Swiss-Prot record:
This is Aspartate carbamoyltransferase catalytic subunit. L-aspartate binds at residues 92, 175, 229. InterPro entries: Asp/Orn_carbamoyltranf_P-bd (IPR006132), Asp/Orn_carbamoylTrfase (IPR006130), Asp/Orn_carbamoylTrfase_sf (IPR036901), Asp_carbamoyltransf (IPR002082), Asp_carbamoyltransf_Asp/Orn-bd (IPR006131). It comes from Methylorubrum extorquens (strain PA1). It is an enzyme of class 2 (transferase). One of its GO terms (molecular function) is aspartate carbamoyltransferase activity. Gene3D superfamilies: Aspartate/ornithine carbamoyltransferase (3.40.50.1370). It comes from the Bacteria.
Length: 315
């Protein structure tokens, strides 16, 4: 299957993994595989979004995600505008609804949004006439990160069905964890979460995951070890005694990784805190997929933008 022959994506927006069917997910991954091949060519551009306008509206700092969406849009031929919230009317007291109305009046075709409040992207999508992509909303969802993680796993393992995936660390504050739990289980993986009790959401068992507070026990038999960033900017209390203590019990080093399956692969959504969530020799080692995740991010975002383009007028 190529991007041109992929089945039509039945959704006007991409607001989360929740609500996507397994065929929806697999169709996006097939498109992303084609985008990987394109991105590895000398000539990397397509024209599917030529004449279209994409606005990247980020209310939270981002390097990887924003630059990845920008590159994805440009490779598909879009005119891409990055809106700096730090110097925008938002800083002067403008509400999200007013911002949405202002942007809508500019008649963009696609708006990519990251916001610190869960549900904010869904609200904005109801107020505009264009396609909206969720680039992360609070601790709720980060759908393109989960898609790129699935693509990375699939390309290295040949599939996801039956794999044992451990998601480790600050699960409480992680939109990446939530989206990955939903997506990986939809594709047949068995998911377990590992972290201190202070960083695990109450009632997370209802998502069908195994829960471990002992990392060494939790890593046994795992095919994939997915580390999460310790999100200290979202913590207004004492969730961990110290970063040194955190690394001792929940940071991934060689001794802990050895408890997983031989050849288990390591992932991290970035940015990494070396020596806090993961040791440098593991992050840079032969079992690490972290750099590949970055490459897959551009491909997945190209796939998402291209899929949504089918719903644009004359798209």
């Amino acid at each position: 299957m190529t991007a041109q022959t992929a089945p039509a994506f039945p959704h006007r927006h991409l607001l989360g993994i929740e609500g996507l069917s397994r065929p929806d997910i697999e169709a996006l991954l097939e498109r992303a595989d084609a985008a990987v091949a394109l991105s590895r060519q000398v000539e990397k551009k397509r024209t599917v979004l030529r004449g279209r306008t994409q606005i990247n509206l980020f209310f939270e700092p981002s390097t990887r995600t924003q630059s990845s969406f920008e590159l994805a849009g440009k490779r598909l031929g879009a005119d891409v505008m990055n809106m700096s919230v730090a110097s925008s009317s938002v800083k002067k007291g403008e509400t999200l609804i007013d911002t949405a109305a202002t942007l809508n009046a500019m008649r963009p075709d696609i708006i990519v949004v990251r916001h610190h409040a869960a549900g904010a992207v869904h609200l904005l999508a109801r107020k505009v006439d264009c396609a909206v992509v969720n680039a992360g909303d609070g601790a709720h969802e980060h759908p393109t990160q989960a898609l790129l993680d699935a693509l990375t796993i699939r390309r290295n393992k040949g599939g996801i069905e039956g794999l044992q995936v451990a998601i480790c660390g600050d699960v409480l504050h992680s939109r990446v964890a939530r989206s990955n739990i939903i997506l990986l289980q939809a594709l047949g993986a068995r998911v377990r979460v590992i972290g201190p009790s202070t960083l695990l959401p109450t009632g997370i068992e209802r998502f069908g995951v195994e829960v471990f507070t002992d990392m060494r026990a939790g890593l046994k038999g795992c095919d994939i070890v997915m580390m999460l960033r310790l999100q200290r900017e979202r913590m207004n209390g004492s969730f961990v005694p110290s970063v040194k203590e955190y690394f001792r019990y929940y940071g991934l080093d060689g001794d802990k990784l050895a408890l997983a399956k031989p050849g288990a692969l390591v992932m991290h959504p970035g940015p990494m805190n070396r020596g806090v969530e993961i040791a440098s020799d593991i992050a840079d080692g032969t079992q690490s997929l972290i750099r590949e995740q970055v490459e897959m991010g551009v491909a997945v975002r190209m796939a998402v933008l291209e899929a949504l383009a089918t719903h644009l007028p004359n798209g």
